[in-house]
């Protein structure tokens, strides 16, 4: 996964006991999703109980960083940006930003890949760009 250069400062996430492993992984350039060892489903956001079968036999699983745009919206303003739902190759759909692209050429179903924005505070925020 690559590190992107933001136009505007990306705020560091508030990290707590439940989210620490997730954010530690992003600082290393990895995006983890939850995976259930009982039913095999991947899910996002990672949490201790599987949202599909309610098993507590869950773990973090690194995802490929590949996905497709499910839907998106471009917000035009002083600093235009795109917010989108991206469906990961592993199955979960996540809310994220699409960066470093021509907003006018985005399309639902378009392939995207993971990039990280360094917050400058020891963490990185996962976002996507056109593949």
Task: Please place each PLM-identified region on the residue numbering.
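A broadly conserved sequence feature marking short terminus-proximal activation segments
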Residues: 1-31, 130-131
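Residues immediately within or flanking Cys/His clusters that coordinate Zn2+
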Residues: 30-33, 47
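Cys/His-coordinated zinc-binding microdomains
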Residues: 37-40, 54
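Conserved hydrophobic positions within beta-strands
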Residues: 67-69, 98
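Short, conserved beta-turn/loop elements at beta-strand boundaries and strand-helix junctions
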Residues: 72-78, 117-119
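Beta-strand/loop nucleic-acid-binding surfaces
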Residues: 92-103
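Short nucleic-acid-contacting surface segments enriched for D/E, G, S/T with interspersed K/R
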Residues: 101-113
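OB-fold/S1-family single-stranded nucleic acid-binding modules
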Residues: 118-131
């Amino acid at each position: 996964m690559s590190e992107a250069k933001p136009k505007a400062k990306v705020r560091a996430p508030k990290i707590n006991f439940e989210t620490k492993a997730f954010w530690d992984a992003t600082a290393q350039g990895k995006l983890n999703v939850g995976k259930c060892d009982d039913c095999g489903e991947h899910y996002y956001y990672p949490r201790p109980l599987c949202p599909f079968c309610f098993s507590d036999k869950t773990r973090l699983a690194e995802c490929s960083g590949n996905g497709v745009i499910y839907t998106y919206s471009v917000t035009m303003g002083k600093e235009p940006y795109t917010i989108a739902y991206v469906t990961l190759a592993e199955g979960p759909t996540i809310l994220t930003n699409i960066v470093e692209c021509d907003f006018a050429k985005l399309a639902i179903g378009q392939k995207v890949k993971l990039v990280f924005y360094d917050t400058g505070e020891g963490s990185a925020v996962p976002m996507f760009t056109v593949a």
